[in-house]
């Protein structure tokens, strides 16, 4: 699904959340993190006992999958509540946790925010309830996003491996018949496209760290690390990161790549009117683009990202989320079974993938003909799902997040994002971001490696 990272919580909200570390999470009748494995008898009893669960999620039409769960387990009544997206969603979760009342049982949780809630002991470790047995059902790198040191903090629901959506007609006017295979070819194509058509080969948004981090992910960069306790690693201004951003600075300063904020009217228009000849985006992008630039149907094609070396096939990820269970739940078994079932039952996961167009993290869906064999008219009949399914297998599994990514995203806009918007020194922007992140970590009591 489209990531909700453009507008996140400010530093004060993050600091308040970190203070919750000193709070004791409610055991909730088995909601603690050190529970013995639930026996099958206990699971059967929990699922056959009249129970009310509350599920906070922004996912459109997720009631469809919840209805399937309730048909399977009629004694479980699930109330689906949309309390907002992005900052509103996470702030309300934190407020409910701090107040020790009104918190839901199950919550939608983007991967980059799991560490911050795990730090405050707000998430139930699902491993004792059987989640550790699900690892083989998911792509390796996805499972790493929800697990740490044997604990499992969420059940993956959707992901966003990166690819390249491009206008075949615009590139064709520049004499380009295939998507650039390498970043060197991409830069050459950018010159040709601008000269022949006036279009930008793509746009690099100054307000969206998610896209930049995905590109760094593809480049093998490891900007963050977290030991699960009080030690973090911050390395956003490494030589490799500066090399990658130097590439983009060159294209920006030569006016070959635009720098419009994304998910704005100006940006939507650019996708629809040919200002941008392409969009480096995630697997949720193809369907999103159809709704944004519908009149350009048939003109777009999809490809993997350009590579740093010929013959390579490596990608990064942008977006996606899981379903997590709060540690305060009074019904941990039923809550876990809800999160597990809607993201593992084949009827449910196929519905997510083929009707709501969430890009799947489950191996069996990524191989299912009902999903991968779909031909997309918008992309000239191309099997776009098949392409992105293949790309999903090329994402590096070793990518971590800071336990204060709320501040990570907002400080990006004040540093790297500002440099992009001003078409300035992106290396200096990375240095400033590094300083902001390390200073914040120290102020919050973290040890910085």
Question: What residue spans do the PLM features occupy?
Answer:
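Conserved N-terminal structural module of periplasmic/extracytoplasmic solute-binding proteins
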Residues: 2-11, 15-16, 20-115, 134, ...
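Hinge/lid segment of periplasmic solute-binding proteins
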Residues: 37-42, 111-162, 215, 301-303, ...
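C-terminal lobe and pocket-closing loops
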Residues: 47, 284-296, 309-411, 444, ...
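Short helix-initiation/N-cap motifs at beta->coil->alpha
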Residues: 82-93, 112, 183-188, 260-273
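Alpha-to-beta junction loops
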Residues: 97-109, 124, 198-200, 273-282
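A structural signal for short loop-to-beta-strand junctions that line the ligand-binding cleft
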Residues: 103-105, 133-171, 201, 312-316, ...
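Extracytoplasmic/periplasmic solute-binding protein
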Residues: 153-157, 162, 184-233, 240, ...
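Glycine-centered hinge/linker elements that transmit conformational signals in sensory
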Residues: 190, 230-261, 305
